Amino acid sequence: SELALYNTVLSGMALDGKSFFYVNPLSVVPSACHADSRLQHVKTVRQKWFGCACCPPNIARIVSSIAAYAFTENEDTLLTHLYLGGSIRKTFPTGTLTLSIASDMPWDGHITVTLHADSPVSGTLGFRLPGWCPNPNVTADKPVRVADGYAYLSGEWHDGETIVLDFPMPVRLIRANNRVREDMRQVAVTRGPITFCAEQADNGENLHLLRVDVEDFGKDGEGVQVLPDSRFGHRTVKLLVPGFRQ
């Protein structure tokens, strides 16, 4: 769900929340969309609104209810699935515990969880270990038990205790399955939960002629420059990937 939320749901909406893609295919050729009447429903820039605007309100509803996807609970356990900055309060049989989460996901994998309680509270906290992270690390004063993709910490919690989660974000090159004819020789560049997009605005026309230089890319993406980008009033990250145009 994390990959879908970041790469499908959010990418359909502009950063300012005022324009949208109604359809959002993985690859768009502007000249083809403008020339072929069968493709004119595929817009090359986000649109302000639609005559039948069923999807934009659904995106807004998902974003506004994201906390329901981020956490689940039972009587003595609180599970964290999505690392959103903010706070969550959980009532255990022995008392109430508040988790304050400092997170800059999806751009930075360092997360600090600070616990607040009026008195000691016993219970279990579980944190999802993302599948995109090869070497996650959890630091706390409690033993860590890993099961089914989650790190579980159980015991008596005190006010001011912290749990630190580190999810390294190497840049990865993911190759498409050659059994899919249209995806032959295609790759995706990812970092953390984000799949990055090469756009004409940054790279010029004829994107199909771009090739990633696999040798310079490096085994673990060490040849890629990870640069902060705040051009649009929001902190994001852009990648400079070694490559060439055929």
PLM ranges: what are they?
Residues 120-140:
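Beta-strand-rich binding/interaction modules
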Residues 2-7, 12-116, 146, 158, ...:
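C-terminal beta-rich recognition modules with glycine/proline-rich loops and embedded aromatic residues
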Residues 114, 128, 139, 154, ...:
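Beta-strand residues in well-ordered beta-sheet regions across diverse protein folds
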Residues 133-154, 172-179:
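Solvent-exposed beta-strand/loop surfaces of large extracellular or lumenal domains
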Residues 103, 115-119, 128-131, 155:
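Non-cytosolic beta-sheet module surface loops
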